[in-house]
Amino acid sequence: MNVILPEVGKPPFATFYLLHGLSDDHTRWLRQTSIERYVEGLPLIVVMPDGGRGFYTTHHQGHDYARYIAHDCVQFVERNFPARPRRQSRCIGGLSMGGYGALRVALGYPDLFVSANSHSGALMIGSRKRQKDRPLSEWEFNAIFGRNPAGTDHDLLHLATNALTAGRLPKIRIDCGVDDFLLESSRTFTRRLDELGVPHEYEEYPGEHNWAYWDEHIRDALTFHAKHMRLKAD
């Protein structure tokens, strides 16, 4: 886990949990983007945990990465850093696998996070149609999600509907590059959100599935989260 602590403001601070992608680890956001510079002036802790290749969900066979983020990481951070322990002061985001993971955790634990964002997310896990560009082998996919994740807690549409019905839906922001191989996944997912009446923001920008895109658009995510957590730059 890497943590950026604010140099401005008075504690306790809001917290942004920032999740990496499938082939990455907890160091990549710091090594590949200017996230530390972008949060200068914000009273915001940034927490970058390691999720392995686990998709931040509760595995069909084995590990519970969703609980690890929502309980273990949140409790560790709030016991050891000056983090404000309330929903209004927690947000979560990520890229690719982490984009799915951010929505999976926020929608699965809607009492914990006020907002969630996904960059270039692999969002249609619940689809029965196998994606030709899915970055997992069939064995690995089934070990994590099972053979038919539709309608389960791996299915973001299922979780979003439940959170909406309960009146605890986090604010949602999704973006994707127009040359990203996951663009159709983002378009299909947001179209289904519209059909289900789930409020969200969706943007498409020039760009591919790479760090140049994520470095640019993490700033949009910070603006989004700061608005919903009512943060003001110093």
Region spans (language model):
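Non-catalytic cap/lid and distal C-terminal segments of serine-dependent acyl enzymes
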Residues: 1-234
